Amino acid sequence: MPTVTYVHPDGTKHEVEVPTGKRVMQAAIGAGIDGIVAECGGQAMCATCHVYVESPWADKFPSISEEEDEMLDDTVSPRTEASRLSCQLVVSDDVDGLIVRLPEEQV
């Protein structure tokens, strides 16, 4: 089963085993990870599941959709090249070991 490591702004790390097909946001909520609010429940409508995905992981996910791109413009924490909505990131064996950094704030 793939693992995802969530890194808080203070450097605290939480490693979670995630079944393939589950979204990075769902895994965080299920594991009780603070820092993912997910107000819209994963519909890409609120930008409160914003995370930073660094290389080489960023290239293993589909490109940002127009909808996700628009929502990322409304994040509370600064948008960077690494910004993604975790509700749009589906875990697969290709991303085993994925590291996502959580922003300072979501709302």
UniProtKB/Swiss-Prot annotation:
Alphabetical GO biological process terms: P450-containing electron transport chain
Cofactor: [2Fe-2S] cluster
PANTHER family: FERREDOXIN-2, MITOCHONDRIAL (PTHR23426:SF65), FERREDOXIN/ADRENODOXIN (PTHR23426)
Organism of provenance: Rhodococcus erythropolis (Arthrobacter picolinophilus)
Protein known as: Rhodocoxin
Note on cofactor: Binds 1 [2Fe-2S] cluster.
Organism lineage string: Bacteria, Bacillati, Actinomycetota, Actinomycetes, Mycobacteriales
Every 2Fe-2S ferredoxin-type domain range: 2-106
Entry binding sites for [2Fe-2S] cluster: C40, C46, C49, C87
Gene, per the UniProt record: thcC
Keywords tagged on the record: 2Fe-2S, Electron transport, Iron, Iron-sulfur, Metal-binding, Transport
Highest taxon of the lineage: Bacteria
GO CC terms, sorted: cytosol
Biological role stated in the UniProt entry: Ferredoxin-type protein which transfers electrons from rhodocoxin reductase to cytochrome CYP116 (ThcB), which is involved in the degradation of thiocarbamate herbicides.
Family (UniProt): Belongs to the adrenodoxin/putidaredoxin family.
GO MF term set: 2 iron, 2 sulfur cluster binding; electron transfer activity; metal ion binding
Keyword Transport in annotation: yes
